[in-house]
A protein has these predicted regions:
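Conserved class I S-adenosyl-L-methionine
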Residues: 117-145
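Conserved Class I S-adenosyl-L-methionine
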Residues: 6, 32-34, 151-247
């Protein structure tokens, strides 16, 4: 389901850093590697792209899909790289999940060369994503407060002022934050719900979901998202803040 949510944001994120042939780029919290794979062609044979994630299962998928990238398992708050190791660092939809986002940003700053470029994307407030907003309300009613809280955390860094502040506090300069909108597409509201509950954030946490609770959740979300149903499936807007900065 990665294409449904993330792929359309990749060119926007990479445009912010304007990769050049021969450069070294680090993709922090790379997941299955969609950003890193796209970057390979931009840095060319003389460049080098590294994708880092703390989740070994995600990296296994990434390795199978992107042999031209160096995949590393590691912690964004303690990057296993030397100071000034990269020309560019990017992070797509990972910053909000780090236990200490400030520490992760300081680490990104450390591994960049002087004048290095950094770009990050984080979702705006959950109200800007009707699909996830409806899902979170349903989770609260049918699964529980813990599940709803985990879903809300995906949108937990949705304030542009806060994003700018933590970047500047980490030592970044020339910080620019802008808001963008894209459309997330799924075959149906049911598959969207199942993907999030069983295969995305909640699926990696151990939160137990009973069959009858999931069925009730699917019915509620399907009803709430009828205004966003199209002939080819579900399509709802999502908004993100994209920030660019330099060391």
């Amino acid at each position: 389901m990665v294409p449904a949510v993330f792929v359309s944001w990749v060119p926007v994120l990479l445009d912010l850093v304007a990769l050049k042939p021969g450069e070294r780029m680090l993709d922090v919290a790379c997941g299955t590697g969609v950003v890193a794979r796209h970057a390979v062609s931009q840095v060319g044979e003389g460049g080098h792209v590294v994708g880092l994630d703390i989740n070994g299962n995600m990296l296994a998928l990434a390795r199978a899909r992107g042999p031209s990238v160096e995949w590393r398992e590691g912690d964004a708050m303690a990057l296993p790289f030397a100071t000034n190791a990269f020309d560019v660092v990017v992070c797509q939809q990972g910053l909000q999940f780090f236990p200490d986002s400030g520490k992760a940003l300081r680490e990104a700053h450390r591994v960049l060369v002087p004048g290095g470029r950094f770009a990050v994307a984080v979702w705006c407030a959950i109200e800007s994503s009707p699909g996830h907003h409806a899902l979170t309300r349903g989770l609260e009613r049918h699964i529980g407060a813990e599940a709803a809280g985990l879903m809300s955390a995906v949108f937990g860094l949705g304030d542009a002022g806060t994003l700018q502040m933590i970047l500047e506090n980490a030592g970044f300069q020339d910080v620019r934050v802008r808001r963008e909108k894209r459309v997330a597409r799924f075959p149906s509201a049911e598959l969207f719900t199942r993907w999030v509950v069983m295969g995305s954030v909640l699926g990696r946490t151990g939160v137990q979901v009973r069959d009858e609770s999931l069925a009730a959740l699917i019915r509620e979300v399907d009803g709430a998202l009828q205004p966003y149903m199209r002939a080819d499936g579900l399509a709802f807007p999502m908004e993100a803040h994209l920030a660019a900065a330099r060391t």
